[in-house]
Amino acid sequence: MNPAHLLILSAVCVSLLGAANVPPQHLNLYQFKNMIVCAGTRPWIGYVNYGCYCGAGGSGTPVDELDRCCYVHDNCYGEAEKIPGCNPKTKTYSYTCTKPNLTCTDAAGTCARIVCDCDRTAAICFAAAPYNINNFMISSSTHCQ
C-alpha cells in the first residue's frame, strides 16, 4: 500500500476512535413519538410532514386544527428555549402513559417538565384534531406563505 494512503487511513481510524468516545445526544423526539402513540390511535409518522408546522420548521398560517397543534407546540418549544441551558429538542424527561392518559412527572418549573408539558399538550391535541390527508406533505412554498 502507498505510504500516503496508509497515513490517511490511519488518521481516519484515529478520528473514528475518538468520535466513538463522544456520547450521543439523547433526543426527546423518541419520547414525543411515544406520547403521540399513547394519546392517540393514528401512526405518529403521519405528523412528520403535515401542514405548515408539523415537522421541521414552519411558516405562514396553520392550514387546520391539527397544524395549529404543531404551531402551538413549536411556540411552546420556543418558550422553553428562553430558559438558560434548556434545549427542548434534546432534553429528556420523565412521564407515565396509561393509554390514553399522559402524566409528566418531573418537578414543576424545570426544563424537563416544561418540555414534557409541551409534548403532552401536543400529543393530546393531535389525538383530538381531525386528520386531513390532503394536508400531508403539502408544498410549503404554495400553502405556507
From Swiss-Prot:
Q: Please list the GO biological process terms of this entry.
A: arachidonate secretion; lipid catabolic process; phospholipid metabolic process
Q: Which GO terms describe its cellular component?
A: extracellular region
The job of this chain, per UniProt, is described as: PLA2 catalyzes the calcium-dependent hydrolysis of the 2-acyl groups in 3-sn-phosphoglycerides.
Where found? Secreted
Q: What is this protein called?
A: Acidic phospholipase A2
Tell me which family the UniProt entry assigns to this protein.
Answer: Belongs to the phospholipase A2 family. Group I subfamily. D49 sub-subfamily.
Asked whether the keyword Calcium is assigned, the reply is yes
